[in-house]
Amino acid sequence: MVRAKRKLDHIEYALSTGQSRTHGFHDIDFVHQSLPNSNYDTITCETKIGELSLSSPIFINAMTGGGGEKTLHINEQLAYVAKHHNLAMAVGSQMAALKDESEAASYKVIRKVNPNGIFFANLGSEATIEQAERAVDMIEANALQIHLNVIQELTMPEGDRDFTGVLQRIEKIVLNSKVPIIVKEVGFGMSKETMQQLVNVGVTAIDIGGQGGTNFAAVENERRQRMLSYFNNWGIQTATSIIEATSTNNNLSFIASGGIQTALDVAKAIALGANTTAFAGYFLRILMQDGIEKLLDEIELLHTDLKFIMTALGAKTIEELQSVPLVVKGETYHWLMQRGIDTAHYSRR
């Protein structure tokens, strides 16, 4: 009951605290192309995360589940949206259903709605091999997200305080999983050092989950009597984290998430090196406040606008979009220079 109540609290406070939009994409400018040699009607948006082929570089990221009928209904609607637009979708942490079988329906509903969809299971880094297998089987998942949420746990009144052995547990799951593993942050970004550690234990796909979207420190602080306000601005911005990711020069698939709301955000994230982008809080807000039809329309417009931007840049495919010239400036540039990451290659390609 406590876990289910927390799930509902997260939805309420995620909506009320909003998104900060401090993602850093305002520091990224495309180099205009007056002769793009492109045709809107022939632009294609297919992409891949590792070996998983996706029809769109937009997917519905982990949001909820395990909070009774309300979370079941949300996942049911999101699965319908995913089916309508042929998008991949992740569920929220399934630990609730592993602890209480009665909550499993709030996750399993997605397969009922969209039997042939691409779905990602989701667990925290405390998960065991056996729990990972059960989570995947629960929704017949195509991949498993393992989320890293140290700051959220520390801010959460009833959260974990021991984070020893996390990398070793992830390595065991990677070695024993029958589906690909995606390690993701939850709004605080990932450093190049963290990503290198994950690569070293066999991880091949990462969702950088940058600062700029739903702020889970702020969400958990709403649930505390004594706020840990020093965590409210903690983290690495989304744009910065993508560039940190690409600087590792590893054969990783990168998912960009954290405050992404527009087609321009999507295009910039991909041009910086992401293979795909993920939306959570923005989609949830539209669904809860304006309804499912509005969300369906918004996703249609996102795809239309992304193709307009790709046409302007002369990028006929997502792969070509990853190599268009752009300039990194402002605070993002200064952060990266201090970190020893040269951005000049982006502007000269």
From Swiss-Prot:
FMN binds at residues 62-64, 93, 122, 184, 214, 258-259, 280-281. Signal peptide: none annotated. It catalyses: isopentenyl diphosphate = dimethylallyl diphosphate. The keyword Cytoplasm applies. InterPro entries: Aldolase_TIM (IPR013785), FMN-dep_DH (IPR000262), IPdP_isomerase (IPR011179). GO terms for cellular component: cytoplasm. One of its GO terms (biological process) is isoprenoid biosynthetic process. Pfam families: FMN_dh. It is found in: Cytoplasm. Its cofactor is FMN; NADPH; Mg(2+). It comes from the Bacteria. Its EC number is 5.3.3.2. Substrate binds at residues 6-7, 152. Mg(2+) binds at residue 153. GO terms for molecular function: FMN binding; isopentenyl-diphosphate delta-isomerase activity; magnesium ion binding; NADPH binding; oxidoreductase activity. Keywords: Cytoplasm, Flavoprotein, FMN, Isomerase, Isoprene biosynthesis, Magnesium, Metal-binding, NADP. Involved in the biosynthesis of isoprenoids. Catalyzes the 1,3-allylic rearrangement of the homoallylic substrate isopentenyl (IPP) to its allylic isomer, dimethylallyl diphosphate (DMAPP). Belongs to the IPP isomerase type 2 family. Homooctamer. Dimer of tetramers. This is Isopentenyl-diphosphate delta-isomerase. The gene is fni.
